[in-house]
A protein has these predicted regions:
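Extracellular adhesion/carbohydrate-binding repeat motifs centered on closely spaced tryptophans
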Residues: 1-213
Length: 213
């Protein structure tokens, strides 16, 4: 078997590179090269929607790029600051080698991130904190500093939660056509998902909110 299939926490890596299980408390693995910090929209570059007709019919198919003022497109991780409808935010975004912005689940090296699918003016931004996934219906925790997905026991807000550190069966599959991960509706627990109202592999019971008492 390809090592990316074995090691990617139950999800194959569809864009090359070596997958990984992550693990521990989810410390940062984000800065792996190709990063651009502190870009101001309107000064250092501007957004461009490359497929407006398709995106109007299906917003999730939107293909955004960030054109740099000095030429070319942003690639890899980029920290963008801009204002939308009176709200100013600064956050990390990731762009593929062709400059198209990534969204949804994203694997960088051995670390998983979630890039917003919310069309609220900040589509594609790195999500931090608790994330309830609309596809598999499960909860995940993304580090509030690095955005890296947590696995195993994590102390969050003074409480302990258990986030699945293994995935014996693949549950998410990469769609090369859309460049996005999709849940395969497999009867197996996804990597990183929170245990709820059950006993963890090491014998501790967590309640319906995932909290160990």
């Amino acid at each position: 078997l390809n090592d990316a299939v074995v090691d990617a926490g139950g999800r194959t890596h569809g864009r090359g590179g070596r997958g990984g299980s992550g693990g521990g408390s989810g410390s940062s693995g984000r800065k792996t090269g190709g990063q651009t910090a502190g870009l101001r929209v309107g000064l250092d570059g501007n957004w461009e929607l490359t497929n407006p007709v398709e995106a109007t019919a299906n917003p999730d198919s939107s293909k955004w790029v960030f054109n740099l003022a000095n030429g070319g497109r942003a690639k890899g991780w980029a920290y963008l600051s801009y204002t939308y409808e009176g709200k100013t935010k600064s956050e990390w975004y990731h762009f593929a080698e062709d400059g198209i912005m990534d969204s949804g689940w994203f694997l960088d090296g051995s670390t998983w991130y979630y890039l917003s699918m919310n069309h609220n003016g900040f589509y594609g931004e790195m999500v931090k904190g608790w994330h309830h996934d609309g596809q598999d219906g499960r909860w995940y925790y993304l580090d509030p500093s690095s955005g890296a997905m947590h696995t195993n026991w994590s102390k969050i807000g003074g409480e302990y939660y258990f986030l699945n550190p293994t995935a014996p069966a693949q549950t998410w599959f990469f769609d090369n056509a859309t460049g996005r991960w999709n849940f395969g509706d497999i009867n197996s627990r996804p990597y990183g998902s929170m245990y709820q109202n059950e006993t963890t592999p090491d014998g501790y019971h967590v309640n319906e909110s995932g909290v160990w008492r």
